[in-house]
């Protein structure tokens, strides 16, 4: 149990997708104007990462990895070259399902997210989570914990940034820094703050 807690905490703080690896910055910067919208997108990212990482773990280590098809009588088969297209296909299918669910049951959130919801398909934080799972050879349970933890970490980062940006609306920001300038500066300072977690050994 401690091992899974360690993976979960590390994926949120020490290995934060947005602030440690700078993945998913497109939606991270574009949708972080309002806390409510950021939370909605964050939940969507948690769902997609929490499902796509373990699903891709099953597919990769049982079908695509070198020697994975030994159970079918093909011990020398290596289909790992199909990894990228398979991972992206699974992610795209999950995002499409999520989009239909939001459109039907949460139309206000669906409208608020707009074009950024289908952009989760090409959000490199999602693919990054899957590729880190493959690189670290996580088992199914570790993949589930890592996927959910990475999603929670990304959501935490975007909600924090959105909260700061909402407060900055009432601040006297210098003209040259208004807009993306102050947003990049704020994100950089947040990343430096999250670096303080890197010294913690779990």
Swiss-Prot record:
EC numbers: 7.2.1.1
Single GO molecular function: oxidoreductase activity, acting on NAD(P)H, quinone or similar compound as acceptor
GO terms (BP aspect): respiratory electron transport chain; sodium ion transport
Membrane topology: Multi-pass membrane protein
Enzyme class, first EC level, given as a word: translocase
Localisation: Cell inner membrane
Annotated transmembrane regions: 11-31, 41-61, 81-101, 114-134, 144-164, 180-200
One term under GO cellular component: plasma membrane
Annotated keywords: Cell inner membrane, Cell membrane, Ion transport, Membrane, NAD, Sodium, Sodium transport, Translocase, Transmembrane, Transmembrane helix, Transport, Ubiquinone
Domain of life: Bacteria
InterPro entries to which the protein is assigned, alphabetical: NqrDE/RnfAE, NqrDE/RnfAE_oxidrdctase, NqrE
Reactions it catalyzes: a ubiquinone + n Na(+)(in) + NADH + H(+) = a ubiquinol + n Na(+)(out) + NAD(+)
Principal location listed in the UniProt entry: membrane
Family, per entry: Belongs to the NqrDE/RnfAE family.
Function: NQR complex catalyzes the reduction of ubiquinone-1 to ubiquinol by two successive reactions, coupled with the transport of Na(+) ions from the cytoplasm to the periplasm. NqrA to NqrE are probably involved in the second step, the conversion of ubisemiquinone to ubiquinol.
Subunit comment: Composed of six subunits; NqrA, NqrB, NqrC, NqrD, NqrE and NqrF.
Name assigned to this protein: Na(+)-translocating NADH-quinone reductase subunit E
Species in which this protein is naturally found: Psychromonas ingrahamii (strain DSM 17664 / CCUG 51855 / 37)
């Amino acid at each position: 149990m401690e091992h899974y807690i360690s993976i979960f905490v590390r994926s949120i703080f020490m290995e934060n997708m947005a602030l440690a690896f700078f993945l998913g910055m497109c939606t991270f910067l574009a949708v972080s104007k309002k806390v409510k919208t950021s939370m909605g997108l964050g939940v969507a990212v948690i769902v997609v990462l929490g499902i796509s990482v373990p699903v891709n773990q099953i597919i990769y280590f049982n079908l695509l990895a070198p020697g994975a098809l030994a159970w079918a009588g093909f011990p020398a088969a290596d289909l790992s070259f199909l990894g990228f297209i398979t991972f992206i296909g699974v992610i795209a299918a999950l995002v499409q399902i999520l989009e239909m669910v939001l459109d039907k049951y949460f139309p206000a959130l669906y409208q608020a997210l707009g074009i950024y919801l289908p952009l989760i398909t090409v959000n490199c934080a999602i693919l990054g989570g899957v590729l880190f799972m493959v690189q670290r050879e996580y088992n199914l349970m570790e993949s589930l914990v890592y996927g959910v933890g990475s999603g929670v970490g990304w959501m935490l980062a975007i909600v924090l940034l959105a909260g700061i940006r909402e407060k900055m609306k009432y601040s006297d920001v210098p003209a040259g820094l208004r807009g993306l300038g102050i947003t990049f500066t704020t994100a950089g300072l947040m990343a430096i703050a999250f670096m303080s977690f890197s010294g913690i050994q779990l």
